[in-house]
Amino acid sequence: MIFDFNYIHIFMLTITSYVGLLIGALVFTLGIYLGLLKVVKLI
């Protein structure tokens, strides 16, 4: 079997970017949630 390193590189890059977006979305959601909690505590 001959491995196509270019294909593997693109595959890894896609997975990395997908995981990065997923983590970014989680951090963004947590940031909004914590922000709302602070606002509720202030009121």
UniProtKB/Swiss-Prot annotation:
Source organism superkingdom: Eukaryota
Protein's recorded name: Cytochrome b6-f complex subunit 6
Keyword Coiled coil: no
Free-text description of this protein's post-translational modifications in UniProt: The N-terminus is blocked.
Residue ranges of the TM segments: 17-37
Lineage of origin: Eukaryota, Viridiplantae, Chlorophyta, core chlorophytes, Chlorophyceae
Matching InterPro entries: Cyt_b6/f_cplx_su6
Classification via HAMAP family: Cytb6_f_PetL (MF_00433)
Annotated GO CC locations: chloroplast thylakoid membrane; cytochrome b6f complex
Main location: plastid
Keywords attached to this entry: Chloroplast, Electron transport, Membrane, Photosynthesis, Plastid, Thylakoid, Transmembrane, Transmembrane helix, Transport
GO terms, biological process: photosynthesis
GO molecular-function terms, A-Z: electron transporter, transferring electrons within cytochrome b6/f complex of photosystem II activity
Membrane topology summary: Single-pass membrane protein
Binding partners and assembly: The 4 large subunits of the cytochrome b6-f complex are cytochrome b6, subunit IV (17 kDa polypeptide, PetD), cytochrome f and the Rieske protein, while the 4 small subunits are PetG, PetL, PetM and PetN. The complex functions as a dimer.
Native species: Chlamydomonas reinhardtii
Subcellular locations according to the entry: Plastid, Chloroplast thylakoid membrane
Note: A deletion of this gene can be substituted for by a subunit IV-petL fusion. The fusion protein does not permit state transitions, although all other functions are wild-type.
Function comment: Component of the cytochrome b6-f complex, which mediates electron transfer between photosystem II (PSII) and photosystem I (PSI), cyclic electron flow around PSI, and state transitions. PetL is important for photoautotrophic growth as well as for electron transfer efficiency and stability of the cytochrome b6-f complex.
Family as reported in the entry's similarity comment: Belongs to the PetL family.
